[in-house]
Design a protein with these regions (language model features):
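The beta1-alpha1 cofactor-binding region of Rossmann-like NAD(H)/NADP(H)-dependent oxidoreductases
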Residues: 8-19, 49
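Residue(s) in the substrate-gating loop at a strand-loop-helix junction
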Residues: 87
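Active-site helix of classical SDR
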Residues: 67, 104
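C-terminal helical subdomain
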Residues: 130, 147-183
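Active-site loop-to-helix junction immediately N-terminal to the catalytic Tyr of the SDR YXXXK motif
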Residues: 94-100
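Substrate-binding pocket helix/loop in short-chain dehydrogenase/reductase
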Residues: 43-45, 51-56
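Conserved NAD(P)H cofactor-binding loop of Rossmann-fold oxidoreductase domains
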Residues: 35-40
Length: 209
């Protein structure tokens, strides 16, 4: 059977990210999924500063550290797949009432696109991509204190779609037609209007609490 080793790490801490990489030692990494992250919903002035900073540490700093270190390892071993889990929120200019979360996922999407371009230009066999789903039926909803306007997809569907698109070496992976249409819409309407629409959706979540 398959031998599984579980390593527990608090990715909000830099030292824990480094320890996780150290624990991998000289093992070859075929696929690395940067999946840790969480969100929060509310007016920016009213949400917890500590929670915001933890979100930045997990959603941005940990992803940055692990992407850089795993990328170096994959380059030295001659290839591999690295998938950063961002969000469709990262493809939208801004998200009122989830300001920190949207900004954190925009960082991941932007960084991933840039790194993917660098790798293509150097002819690398390493793949780097960003998975940008919308609502997925996980515990994210309860942690973020939100109810989504759109129905969520199952984790199984999201994972299977992501792996399929990763193997096709797609840089940005958006799992559903509805979200592809929504993120594409932003190219054709003023940013201020798009941000207002996004904010309206988040505000409805607050009203349903």
């Amino acid at each position: 059977g398959t031998h599984v080793v579980i390593e527990t790490a608090d990715l909000s801490k830099k030292d824990e990210c480094l320890r996780l990489m150290s624990a991998l030692g000289d093992k070859r990494i075929g696929v690395f999924i940067n999946n840790a992250g969480f969100g929060d919903c509310g007016r920016f002035a009213d949400t917890s500063l500590d929670k915001d900073l933890d979100m930045i540490d997990v959603n941005i700093r940990a992803v940055h550290i692990l992407t850089k270190l795993v990328l170096r390892k994959m380059r030295s071993q001659g290839g591999g797949y690295l998938l950063n889990v961002a969000s469709s929120a990262g493809l939208i200019p801004a998200g009122p009432y989830m300001a920190t979360y949207y900004a954190s996922k925009a960082y991941v999407a932007s960084m991933t696109r840039a790194v993917a371009r660098e790798l293509r230009e150097e002819g690398s066999q390493v793949y780097v991509g960003a998975l940008c789903p919308g609502p997925v039926n996980t515990e994210f909803n309860s942690v973020a204190n939100v109810e989504f306007a759109l129905p969520g997809i199952t984790p199984e569907y999201c994972a299977n779609y992501a792996v399929d698109q990763m193997k096709r070496r797609r840089t940005v992976i958006v799992p559903t037609f509805t979200l592809k249409a929504a993120t594409t819409l932003g190219r054709f309407i003023p940013q201020s209007a798009y941000i207002a629409i996004a904010g309206h959706q988040q505000k409805k979540k607050l009203a349903r609490r």
